[in-house]
Structures are given as C-alpha cells and as structure tokens.
C-alpha cells in the first residue's frame, strides 16, 4: 500500500490524471482503487497518449511515452534475478528514462552491471539513476509508529522461490517450520513472497504447507498484501538474501 500513498501524493498535483494498471500479483491492493484496470504486462506497449509511465515492477514492454520511470524497491545491492536472466533485465532497464534508487550503493551496483553489459553490444540511451532515498522505509516507519503489536513471534519471509535456487530458503521451509514449532514457544508467521502466491504451481505448495500446519495454534501463513502486521508482531526475522531483511531492520 506504500505505492498507493505515492499515487495519492501525485494526485494532489493540478492537471494530472492518474490511471492504475494491475496484474494478478497486485490485484488485491489495487483493484478496488478508483480508475484502475487489469492488464497483462505484455500489452503495455499498446497504451498510447500518456505523459508518464511509473512502475515498481520491472517490465519488458513499455507504453509509448517520453517519461518511463522505474522505482526499485531494494535498499541494498540484493540480487534481482538469476545470472542467466541478468542481460535481459539490464536491457529492459535501459529502456527507462529514469530509475529511482534508494542509495549510492545501489546506484553504483546498477551502473556496474549496465557498463558490463554495454560491452556486450547492448546499446541504448542510458537512463538517469536518481537517489531518492528509501521511499518504502518512510512508509513503514510512519505505519509502525501508529500501533505496536509485538508478540512472541518469528517471521519467516524468504525471497522469490525461483530466484537463485541454490541460495534461497525454498527447499528448507517445511523442515524449518517444523523445527521451530516443535522446539520453541514462539508463534511462527510464514510470509511467502508475493510472487510465489501469484504462481499457480507454487500456490499449490503454499496451500499444502498451510494445510499441514493450520491446526497448530502457533502457526499462521500470511498472504496479506501488506507485510506491516507481520513486522509488528514478530521479534525475530528469518530470511535469505531478500531485501526484506533491511526493511525489517
């Protein structure tokens, strides 16, 4: 819901009309908002007559506009994709006019990758990399000040299960949950990556984990679009290389 707060701020500007497009992964938080529509990201290129395109997703097909803006959600140089997909990622980012990043460290990391792949014949106008600070952190800080719900809970929040499979927690989730439930007095909150919830095959696995532990009063699976309640309730976070570690800290 932090992106919606940004949209509300933009709407305060005169003579700006904001239209929101969403896909399956973002439908729950956006579909009931005013002036929204569902779209497959591959069809973005058919959208015409807009002045600014703003996205917190990496997209590979862009609408026709002179101002294409991508807001990166990482606070540090966490991996974005597997190495074999990195070339296509940089190619897509090079289509942007502006990329909003959270720190100089992230800017230097992205510049290094862009320079690396420019040597491999990916040639296009370079986007402007702008240090905006960590916009999401402002949102989290304000929300957490309102109400603290801290419980004796452990939050288990891995990254997207299909990213860098040799290093993420995916195959260890079930034994970790079992070990924590059997050997601690903590409540366990398992929060899957939103991208896994949107993946139909992975969703079946998530539901099977939920079915396995749902009768345990100390287990909860969190599919909410906002992670703030789980942040508030937990004293400990278990994750892998997900950027959520920095947000949580």
For each feature predicted by the language model, list its residue ranges.
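Conserved catalytic-core segment of nucleotide-activated headgroup transferases in glycan assembly
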Residues: 2-10, 135-208
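Short, surface-exposed amphipathic charged segments that create phosphate/polyanion-binding patches used
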Residues: 50-58, 142-155, 230, 235-239
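Short, flexible loop segments at the rims of nucleotide/cofactor-binding pockets, characterized by
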Residues: 30-36, 75-82, 164-167, 214-220, ...
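Short acidic, S/G/P-rich loop/turn micro-motifs used as interaction or catalytic elements
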Residues: 1-2, 27, 60-61, 75-77, ...
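Active-site and donor-binding regions of nucleotide-sugar-utilizing enzymes
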Residues: 1-141
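Catalytic donor nucleotide-activated moiety binding site of glycosyltransferases and closely related
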Residues: 17-33, 181-223
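A donor-sugar binding/catalytic signature common to diverse glycosyltransferases
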Residues: 58-72, 79, 224-249
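Short His-Asn-centered micro-motif
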Residues: 22, 54-57, 71-72, 102-103, ...
């Amino acid at each position: 819901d932090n992106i919606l707060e940004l949209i509300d701020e933009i709407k305060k500007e005169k003579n700006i009309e904001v239209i929101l497009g969403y896909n399956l992964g973002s439908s729950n938080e956006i579909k009931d908002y005013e002036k929204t529509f569902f779209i497959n990201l591959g069809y973005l290129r058919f959208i015409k007559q807009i002045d600014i395109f703003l996205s917190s997703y990496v997209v590979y097909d862009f609408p026709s506009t002179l101002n294409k803006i991508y807001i990166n959600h990482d606070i540090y140089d966490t991996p974005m994709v597997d190495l074999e997909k990195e070339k296509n990622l940089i190619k897509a980012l090079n289509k942007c006019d502006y990329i909003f990043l959270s720190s100089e460290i992230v800017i230097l990391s992205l510049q290094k990758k862009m320079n690396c792949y420019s040597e491999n014949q990916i040639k296009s106008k370079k986007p402007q990399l702008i240090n905006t600070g960590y916009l999401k952190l402002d949102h989290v800080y304000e929300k957490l000040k309102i109400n603290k719900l801290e419980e004796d809970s452990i939050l288990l929040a891995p990254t997207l299960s299909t990213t860098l499979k040799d290093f993420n927690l995916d195959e260890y989730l079930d034994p970790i949950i079992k070990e924590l439930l059997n050997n601690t007095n903590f409540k366990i909150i398992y929060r899957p990556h939103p991208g896994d919830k949107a993946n139909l095959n992975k969703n079946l696995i998530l539901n099977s984990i939920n079915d396995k532990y749902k009768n345990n009063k100390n287990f909860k699976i969190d599919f909410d679009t906002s992670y703030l309640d789980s942040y508030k309730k937990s004293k400990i976070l278990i994750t892998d290389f997900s950027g959520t570690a920095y947000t949580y800290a």
